[in-house]
Amino acid sequence: MPVTSELILAALLLVGVLAKSHLIAAAACILLFIKLARFDLAFNFLEQKGLELGLLILLLTIMVPLANGKISERDIIYNLTSIPGLLAILGGALATHLNSQGLQMMQADPAIIFGLIIGSIFGILFLGGMPVGPLMAAGIAALFMEFFKYTK
């Protein structure tokens, strides 16, 4: 019996449910529904705009405290001048660099996403992690790959 995309999505749905990763389970379920409904236009849209849409929703969520006034001018100044704030700026800059490396790796080898999903599930189960983004996971994997290239 050949391994089909439907079977892989069903397996990811099951693993997501068993691992109590509602995001992975929901994503697999939605993609399985789209596949079974033969709504291929949705795949095109998700491939072209899904990442941007997801990042937009994430940024909106993160920026709500700015919009509703929970972060004051004093908080902003502190975070631009304090050690924790400067480290946060550095962390943000490094994270975006890693994310771009991860995106390049996923574009060059789309099959790598399966390993990232499995790694995310292990992180949830054994490290108490949160599957926030395959981009960061791919970025870290790309960093590891670069490290191994230099150590050979």
Curated annotation (Swiss-Prot):
Entry annotated with the keyword Transmembrane helix: yes
Major localization listed first in the record, in broad terms: membrane
Subcellular location: Cell membrane
Membrane topology field: Multi-pass membrane protein
Pfam families membership: DUF441
InterPro entries recorded: UPF0756_TM (IPR007382)
Keywords: Cell membrane, Membrane, Transmembrane, Transmembrane helix
GO cellular component labels: plasma membrane
Regions annotated as coiled coil: none
Similarity field: Belongs to the UPF0756 family.
Protein known as: UPF0756 membrane protein Daud_1310
